[in-house]
Amino acid sequence: MVNTLKLPVGIDSFEKIRRNGFYYIDKTNLIEQILMNWGEVTLFTRPRRFGKTLNMSMLKSFFEIGADVSLFEGLYIAKNKELCDAYMGKYPVIFLTLKGVEGLTFADAKRMLGTILANEMDRHYYLKTSDALTDEDKAYFAKMLTGTDENIKDSIRKLSQLLYKHHGKKAVIIIDEYDVPLDKAYQNGYYREMVSLIRGLFGQALKTNDYLQFAFLTGCLRVSKESIFTGLNNFKVLSIMDSRFDEQFGFTDDEVKKLLASYGLASHFPETKEWYDGYHFGNADVYCPWDVINYVDELNYDQTVEPQDYWSNSSGNAIVRRLIDKADVQTKDEIERLIVGECIEKELSQELTYDELDKNIGNLWSVLFTTGYLTKQGRTADGKIRLAIPNKEIKNLFIKKIREWFRDTSANDGKRLEEFCNAFLEKNTEKIEQLFGEYLWNTISIRDTAVAKEKKENFYHGILLGLLGYKANWLIKSNAESGTSYSDILVEVPNNRTGIVIELKYAGNGDLDAACAEALKQMEEKSYVDKLKQDGMRNFIKYGIACFKKDCRVVIAG
């Protein structure tokens, strides 16, 4: 029977998912693992959209006083009755997600942080009338509710103290996306001020806090301990390199197969794996949950839908562009190897500060790994990490960013672009060949590997389109229907009514002349100029272009 449960697209509240009949992949084993591997302060680092917030929401629902036992019925953790009796619903919980702390100025971001803290205070509004609190405590709490600046650094510690007075229990502190304020501060130029604020906030809450039971933090980066966790000796970091908890963030093969089968979509497993699997956390191979849930949700309505770039489209992916912008010859070569499925070997830094990210290429490789753009494929004998692109979605992202970089850098040299485009009108094949070849040598290409010929042609096709697009008054059509087939590129130059046909071929065996001849023959057989004639063009120029690796050949039809 096909599952009728709704899919939780974009929902990261455990309680909402369980109460409202959404499909839930059981990750409550995380609770048991946490309690069996005790740590007073635990930081989980995982890429974005890997279920961090949902898991933290689950921990809140489990530990918080007044916990609803029914939320966990039928789940893994409910089988461990002894553990549930000892810990479920036993602690006051302070739950903060810092993903919304941003602003163009430090004052704006600080104000936003104050609002988030005040909202969490408001969730414990009962403290305002608690008999266990003194009048001084209540006055302080009322002041904290306003979110005023001077209370920020001590606010979490003070709230845990007030909760202890009321409940007689130490607090569980959960801070989700702890590093977002630092990331935004780095982007907007107030990094040092934000580091000072967060260091003070965390130092009070996590280091010198007698009212802390245990704390859980999540983030994408393991920010240097010396940066914001100074002196925190009770600190345990569980990164994507750690085998502990390796299946608790992300979906496993079996979980994805079960999900697809539940909705009658088992036949779509191969493409789901090709596009969204490939991440190696510890000893586990996992899929990106955001991708899988979105894809299954779309398949549920239309089984012909193709996989999409859900994860990569949920962010600007600036880190990939920064790598490409800074790439020297060696780095370009390494990016090319990654795109065709090879591994590169790197020494990675596990602890960075945001202001170190751009200091060298090595730091950028480390961040790409930590944030999910690259994954681990083992180690070398000397301890280097073998890095690879995890799946088809991320490969597409790299290619997209390379094209954007090529377009932007090419546009900076308008004189050269003008010369290149005019060479097509002047029938100057030598100039076209020379300049196109130079562009190919300066970009990052797809190598001659098992990649399908059509994919290689698409790469060169995209570069050529980007270059010709410099001419704002030229009408350029890609893969336009013409005659009895589709031509690669049609160009209409209105001011002299000239139509240009370009057929591009990839010379898989390296024979550029033969590939050009094939292109010209195809143009004659398919009557590609018909569409240009219909559009009023009177003069016609036909080019066959062949590419192999970073070489090209250009011929013109007689």
Predicted feature locations:
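Structural signature of nuclease core domains in nucleic-acid processing machines
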Residues: T429-G558
